[in-house]
From Swiss-Prot:
Role noted for this protein: Induces activation of MAPK14/p38 cascade, when overexpressed. Induces apoptosis, when overexpressed.
GO molecular function annotations of the record: collagen binding
Membrane topology: Single-pass membrane protein
Domain of life, per lineage: Eukaryota
Positions of post-translational Phosphoserine modification: 52
Species classification: Eukaryota, Metazoa, Chordata, Craniata, Vertebrata
Biased composition (Polar residues): 274-295
Parts of the chain that traverse the membrane: 15-35
Keywords: Cell membrane, Membrane, Phosphoprotein, Transmembrane, Transmembrane helix
UniProt subcellular location: Cell membrane
Record organism: Mus musculus
Compositional bias (Basic and acidic residues): 148-158, 172-188
Recorded GO CC terms: basement membrane; extracellular matrix; plasma membrane
Chain segments carrying region Disordered: 47-68, 135-214, 249-303
Protein name (database record): RELT-like protein 2
Amino acid sequence: MSEPQPDLEPPQHGLYMLFLLVLVFFLMGLVGFMICHVLKKKGYRCRTSRGSEPDDAQLQPPEDDDVNEDTVERIVRCIIQNEANAEALKEMLGDSEGEGTVQLSSVDATSSLQDGAPSHHHTVHLGSAAPCIHCSRSKRPPLVRQGRSKEGKSRPRPGETTVFSVGRFRVTHIEKRYGLHEHRDGSPTDRSWGSGGGQEPGGSQAAGGGQPRTGTAAIERLLPEPPPSQAAATHSVQNGRLQDASLVPCTLEGTPGTSAELNLGPRGRDPSPGLSSQEANGQPTKLDTSGQQESLPPEAGGM
């Protein structure tokens, strides 16, 4: 009898399945690689392990803090980072070089209560050498704080208007002063003789401020000088106490309403018929002034 031979088909079928599985995994890897490559181009990140996630997470919080930081905090940080400002703040707080760390004890609490400051929590700023703000305030004398408060609450000067005020900062508007010609002591200056009280000494009486004395003739205002040919004639007439045409008639004190006026022209009285012809020739003539001479007061004759 012959024995049946075993089938070889099952082992061959297993080999085919193995090749198919390898091929499927290879294709899946290629597809995943292509997907990651496409996502990287679009801006996504593909991580193969979770070990790199904490590193990225540690870098992100500082960026978020900078974005969410307030402008006031930035200003305070810039002020504190500057060395000159830090020194000024230390001087304001009244710290000394020999002071160490602040000792939190009951003795400090009792001393603060004795000084008049209420109980508070001790605070330390700008390093360990800086004392507590409330303690430094209590150590200062009250006069200094009162002076500062008075300066902060001082009233504005006249002519200033407050436009904007925030805390100690104040924006004021100063009005322009137009009295530039005044001195610092407030007395105005005289720019011209005619504008103020300053007048020439000679023109005070001519303006009407003074009046002639009693018993004297009125003041005569002379006109421009006559030519030399008529100078002798006018001089002789003045010695005879007559008023020529070259003099302006004035009023006497005794008769203010009337004026003694002598007109020697063709319209006035003509003492002699040949006067106009002689004056036209330029010859000096002696006038016949009988009846035209004014009677002066006795005191004027004595002068």
